[in-house]
Amino acid sequence: MKTSYIIHRTLYLLACLLLMCGCGNRDYDKIGKTEVTIETDRGRIVIRLYDDTPTYRDNFVKLVEQGAYDGAVWHRIVRDGFIQAGTNDEGKYVGNTLPAEIVYPTHFHKAGAVAAAKEDDDVNPDRRGSNTQFYIVTGKVFTPGSLAELRQTMADADTLHGFAPFTELQKRVYTKRGGAPHLDGAYTVFGEVVEGLGVVQSIGHEKTVDEKPVHRIAIKRVSVTKR
């Protein structure tokens, strides 16, 4: 009797695990099917690129296939914010900025979000993004109170330019997983980390001076691993 219970219990748990894995894959397939793997000297990061930001997806894939990020470095770390990188030769690859594809609030700055860097709004009111510089959000976890306070501060400063209050999903993610909500609606988020968020967070805790890492953190190789 006891053995039978254990077997049935084990089968039930395995079924639940398979169901959760299947749902996770379907969820990722809904946002996009292109995956890029970033091999760093701290570990591997896999990102999924969004289909509804096609300009940035295609631009990133093009640069990756040209080897533009192989041998580059993470050159900027903002604590509780993000880690940023560019190409291995900005003079060779930098070009025109890309038109904004801000799909907000569908895509927001949760931990692991991948977005394009850009100039400040005062010189770039159309919020065009860099064609080479990108960042991955590390962020921090908020309490409901601190998140509401931040939202009010953002509204008072008009940094959201009339965008709606945080959705229930945003509130849940920012208070459980964390992120950088103060960046929402201002930058094009074009992908997210699906594997290796711990590596991203580890890089985000590296020692810095004026947001520059004290130790070199290399990107060994970047490749398109799934389409």
PLM segments and residue spans:
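Cyclophilin-like peptidyl-prolyl cis-trans isomerases
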Residues: 22-227
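Helix-centric, low-specificity signal for extended rod-like, repetitive segments
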Residues: 1-2, 19
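Bacterial N-terminal signal peptides
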Residues: 10-20
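Bacterial N-terminal signal peptides that target proteins for export
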Residues: 2-12
